[in-house]
Amino acid sequence: MGKKHTWKRTTAAVMMLGLMTSAAGCSQSAAGKAEETVKQAIEAGKVESTEKDSVIVTMPVTSEPEAGFDPAYGWGAGEHTHEPLIQSTLTTTTTDLKIGKDLATDYSVSEDGLKWTITIRDDVEFTDGKPLTAEDVAFTYNHCRDNSTVSDFTMLKEAVAVNETTVEFHMNHPYSIWPYTMAVVGIVPKHAYDENYGQHPIGSGRYVLKQWDKGQQVIFEANPDYYEEMPEMKKVTVLFMEEDAALAAAMAGVVDVAHTAASYSEQQIDGYGLTAVQTVDNRGFNLPVGEVREKDGITYGNVFTADINVRRAINIGIDREEIIENVLNGYGTPAYSVCDKMPWYHEACEVEYDPGEAVRLLEEAGWREGKDGIRKKQGVRAGFTLMFSSGDSVRQALAEETANQLQEIGIEVKTEGVGWDVAYDRAQSEPLLWGWGAHTPMELYNIYHTAENGNGIGEARYSPYVNETADAYMDEALAASSLEEAYELWKKAQWDGSTGITQDGDIPWIWLCNIEHLYFVRDGLMIGEQKIHPHGHGWSLINNVDLWSWK
């Protein structure tokens, strides 16, 4: 290690106020909050990073797990999936999002896809010294099936411990991507699990929860009895704060990694560099398919976006690179699907920006330019309202940039911030800017497949759309005998040469960009090779924190 990061915390705290209030882009209120958060930690003797084997990281306040560190209630296997750190999982995902093994030494699935058999290691102990067995695995999954509030376990009928090292998963229906579920569900001890587990978790993973000061920080320490190679980082402190406060903390030199946003990307911080991590954290909007109809007080369909030529024109009439430059300061990649770069992604989703062809498609469909530059057809103006979640400045900027671009080809787009209490219903007839991106192909299913319980009209859940051929491919993918076979079927659901969800298919959704996750990282800290991050700017960063090192 060339230089040891042994700065004085108390001196940094004294310097912080001046640094924060002078920092461009940092509001005084945010600066004050950052100062108070870090000063409290310093005074309590909790924030220290003076050794080669410790690190301090900031995360958004929304990353703090409300229900604690319990896999049944969102830890690891929640909306924003990540490795649970405290607990072990049966499988894991590699940097290219293929499946590896953690507790599992072998796994297989029956020919009918209704039984998974997993063999686990026999040398793993929980941090209370008790052995981890198949009983614990079965208990964990059955408990998640019955109680999980954030993850779908409806495919699981029952988990059964056959012996101490063998567990069987009996399924309600074939589910070939079960290994991806096994990669995020942390195993909890049957003997030590109760309603308070999330506050005081016992696991067998790489780290132990040492301290949790709610609303402020969590501290992890390396598990001394971990069954694989000991973590390089023996202590990991996570501070929860907003982006402007995290920036201020980095400027004061009291954190090693600070999450940030594109709006702060031009900040120069002495002793830190800006790191951009590739993601599948995408933004896109739905285009309701089908004519307007109503059911149970909800309007479905849209007279303008029902036209397939309109949807195709919109897809190629948007300059994604310009959006990324204007809204994200260049920190993003064009998105063409909900699963770019994933093993199940079909490259047929990609399109070139072609406003000339977009205009031709609109003209061909009878949408003629009016005196005000907006197209019309049989008295209907070419346009729609593009909604975004209120308070999300990035989605608002994306919506406004999209509106500006589409106006160039004669489409009038109005933007509106809405709350999620009305957004879901309104999205059945109006486009809404969404954020998606997961380490599982099930997201394709959830967005495009006809909803099992219907969405009121027997079509896809989030926006009216039906493609029976694509549905069949996705059903076949879930019933496939191997992940490799399933990957090809997921690709066919996107485009099989004749139909699908791509530009030459039905194009019921438009994808704009994948937002790169940005961090100010202290010089000398090596954060290793990062997996492609899913939706959510939080725990994914420290999936591999055990491999981080100082030089």
Question: What is each residue range found by the language model?
Answer:
Residues 57-59, 129, 250-251, 257-260, ...:
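Periplasmic binding protein-like
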Residues 58-109, 202:
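N-terminal lobe/hinge region of extracytoplasmic solute-binding protein
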Residues 133-140, 164-168, 205-206, 234-235, ...:
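Alpha-helical secondary-structure segments
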Residues 108, 112-115, 151-191, 524:
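Surface-exposed binding/hinge segments that line
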Residues 74, 94-98, 174, 180-231, ...:
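Gly/Pro-rich hinge or "lid" segments in bacterial periplasmic/extracellular proteins
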